[in-house]
């Protein structure tokens, strides 16, 4: 699927739309991330990778890295950098790694909230969001009407 950009709510250019420690502003995601961070990571990775990585694959790889090394934050901090680059959010790789190392859950929930704030329905995945956007565009715009029929 080709890359689509959803309409985002306005916020300061170059800034995260929510704070790093605003985990409880979305209690459902906060609980899911606390008990199973691989789910939140998988959802974020699928959107950031624009569907080239599935939620299940990214989440399973995250869980495997966490079980084998205990350092899944190394994997997830790359996605924070990738997301910052896509949305022109201020920051640097060193700070990304520090945030993921010191508070992985806060980092993951902030990324999740950012994508949600930018118009993504995280439960739909990339393909579902693209389809939703196309359906909304199709309904709002409607089919063009031609007057006069065919002529030579």
Curated annotation (Swiss-Prot):
Which InterPro entries would you find in this protein's record? Answer: PLAC_motif_containing
Record note on disruption phenotype: Strongly impaired growth in the presence of heavy metals such as zinc, cadmium, copper or iron.
Transmembrane segments annotated in the record for this chain: 57-79
Up-regulation conditions: Constitutively expressed. Up-regulated in the shoots by cadmium. Down-regulated under zinc deficiency.
Give the record's keywords alphabetically: Cell membrane, Membrane, Transmembrane, Transmembrane helix
Subcellular location, record wording? Cell membrane
Q: In which tissues is it expressed?
A: Expressed in roots, leaves, shoots, stems, flowers and siliques. In leaves, restricted mainly to the vascular tissue. Expressed in all cells in the root tip, in the vascular tissue and the epidermis in the elongation zone, and only in the epidermal cells in the root hair zone.
Q: List the GO terms this entry assigns under cellular component, sorted alphabetically.
A: plasma membrane
What topology in the membrane does the UniProt record assign? Single-pass membrane protein
Q: Does the keyword Cell cycle apply?
A: no
Q: Name one GO biological process term.
A: response to oxidative stress
The UniProt subunit note reads as follows: Homooligomer.
Q: What is the role of this chain?
A: Zinc transporter acting in both zinc extrusion and long-distance zinc transport. Involved in the loading of zinc into the xyleme and in the detoxification of excess zinc at the epidermal cells. Acts independently from the zinc transporters HMA2 and HMA4. May be also involved in cadmium resistance.
Family membership, please give it.
Belongs to the cornifelin family.
Q: What is this protein called?
A: Protein PLANT CADMIUM RESISTANCE 2
Source species, please? Arabidopsis thaliana (Mouse-ear cress)
Q: What does the organism's lineage look like at the top?
A: Eukaryota, Viridiplantae, Streptophyta, Embryophyta, Tracheophyta
Q: Which gene encodes it?
A: PCR2
């Amino acid at each position: 699927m080709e890359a689509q950009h959803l309409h985002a709510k306005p916020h300061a250019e170059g800034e995260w739309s929510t704070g790093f420690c605003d985990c409880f502003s979305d209690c459902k995601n906060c609980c899911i991330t606390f008990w199973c961070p691989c789910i939140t990571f998988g959802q974020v990775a699928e959107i950031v990778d624009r569907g080239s990585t599935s939620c299940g694959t990214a989440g399973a790889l995250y869980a495997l890295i966490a079980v084998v090394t205990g350092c899944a934050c190394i994997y997830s901090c790359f996605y924070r950098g990738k997301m910052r680059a896509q949305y022109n959010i201020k920051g640097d790789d060193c700070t990304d790694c520090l945030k993921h190392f010191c508070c992985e859950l806060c980092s993951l929930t902030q990324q999740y909230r950012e994508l949600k704030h930018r118009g993504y329905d995280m439960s739909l995945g990339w393909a579902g969001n693209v389809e939703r956007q196309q359906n909304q565009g199709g309904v709002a715009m409607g089919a063009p009407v031609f007057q006069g029929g065919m002529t030579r």
